[in-house]
């Protein structure tokens, strides 16, 4: 041991009830050699365990350092017999992250630009950067391997509160008006060229908040909101997570804010995109404060607005009822995309697009009358086509119009609608 260094004893605490026995075992050593004690608090620490922690430390004369996540610091400090000294350690900034990538990566693996891209996309701690490099090195290490490893490392925590969505769709799968496709292109550029805008072109000196991408996708069910979010994330090379609002909202005061804080922190660190599906459940019109419950609900929404404005990643909100969102909330979004029900020409594209090229179609299969007659969303058309394909496969035949009509009856029956005889005129006449 170097002269002047204080010896330390590290205790990785699993259960608060174990601390008394663990301290008793090291008490003699701390008195004999003046060792300090480092107590590592687990991630699943409960606030009520903090009182037990300080009871167990009663009578310990050695210096004690408690290492914990920021979310547990307040509860531990509140129960302390006297005000403890608190040192907050944040994640390294962009410059430091770039230096860490450069130091830890072997020479010649990545260009300086690629290293800077990793540093900008993933707000990792030094430990997470090291784990990413080790994980990528299992195979041939390179840019693609490092990004894949970084996404895997970063998603470990966020996947506990949100559901990863597969990114199987491409831009060719979208059937949307040209104006909406143009907005999608701009949304992709919003993230792809963020560093150029804020760093190279100097907008960072003028704009402190709202540097991320916040988008509201509004429209009836099945009109392509989730698919568009998946295409956007895929084009940007980001993982996409759908937020389960039932796991975010809580009846206990302060818990919803805590859940939202964890969600945004993990998404920011991992570079993942967030999709709040059916968001009207959480983001409804703010009420006038008539009682304590209303005031608390407004505080929750206010905190969400604050985190969205501070977030530098991608946050997409999908709702079926845009009218339930007030103007103050709408102003926080960079993009407002209204997904309409498809007209006859778009419905024909959807009917044709839902049938893969590999499907064996009947030679006389005419989808025009179905598209012209039935006002369906893309999701409903998908369900009709899929049911028809199963019927044809079960019969050992090609897909015929009667299969599609039977699939159509099943789909319309879900909402009590009636199948009428298809119009035998072209879609061009319809539009």
Where are these regions (language model features)?
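AAA+ P-loop ATPase motor domain of ring mechanoenzymes
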Residues: 1-15, 23-25, 62-285, 290-431
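Hydrophobic/aromatic interaction determinants used to assemble and anchor large protein complexes
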Residues: 8, 29-44, 61
């Amino acid at each position: 041991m170097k002269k002047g260094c204080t010896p330390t004893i590290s205790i990785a605490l699993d259960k608060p009830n174990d601390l008394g026995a663990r301290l008793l075992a090291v008490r003699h050593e701390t008195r004999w050699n003046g060792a300090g004690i480092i107590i590592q608090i687990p991630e699943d620490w409960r606030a009520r365990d903090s009182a037990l922690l300080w009871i167990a430390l009663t009578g310990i004369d050695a210096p004690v350092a408690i290492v914990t996540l920021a979310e547990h610091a307040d509860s531990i400090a509140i129960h302390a017999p006297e005000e403890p000294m608190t040192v907050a350690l944040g994640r390294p900034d962009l410059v430091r992250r770039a230096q860490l990538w450069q130091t830890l990566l072997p020479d010649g693996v990545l260009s300086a630009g690629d290293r800077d891209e990793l540093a900008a996309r993933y707000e990792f701690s030094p430990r997470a950067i090291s784990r990413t490099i080790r994980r990528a090195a299992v195979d041939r290490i390179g840019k693609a391997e490092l990004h894949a490893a970084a996404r895997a490392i970063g998603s470990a925590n966020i996947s506990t509160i949100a559901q990863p969505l597969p990114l199987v769709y491409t831009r060719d799968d979208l059937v949307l008006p040209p104006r909406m496709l143009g907005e999608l292109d701009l949304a992709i550029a919003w993230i792809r060229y963020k560093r150029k805008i804020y760093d190279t072109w100097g907008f960072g000196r003028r704009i402190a908040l709202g540097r991320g991408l916040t988008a509201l996708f509004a429209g009836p069910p099945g009109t392509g909101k989730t698919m568009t979010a998946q295409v956007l994330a895929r084009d940007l090379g980001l993982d996409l997570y759908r937020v389960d609002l039932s796991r975010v909202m809580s009846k206990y005061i302060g818990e919803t804010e805590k859940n939202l804080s964890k969600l945004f922190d993990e998404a920011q660190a991992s570079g993942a995109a967030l999709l709040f599906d059916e968001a009207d459940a959480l983001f409804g019109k703010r009420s006038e404060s008539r009682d304590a419950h209303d005031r608390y609900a407004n505080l929750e929404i206010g905190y969400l607005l604050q985190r969205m404005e501070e977030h530098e990643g991608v946050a997409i909100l999908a709702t079926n009822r845009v009218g339930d969102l007030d103007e103050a909330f709408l102003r926080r979004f960079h993009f407002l995309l209204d997904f309409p029900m498809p007209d006859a020409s778009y419905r024909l594209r959807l009917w044709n697009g839902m049938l893969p090229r590999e499907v064996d179609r009947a030679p006389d299969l005419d989808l025009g009358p179905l598209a012209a007659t039935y006002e369906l969303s893309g999701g409903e058309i998908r369900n009709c086509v899929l049911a028809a394909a199963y019927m044809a496969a079960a019969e050992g035949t090609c897909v015929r119009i009667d299969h599609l009509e039977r699939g159509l009856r099943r789909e319309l029956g879900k909402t009590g609608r009636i199948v009428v005889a298809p119009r035998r005129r072209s879609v061009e006449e319809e539009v």
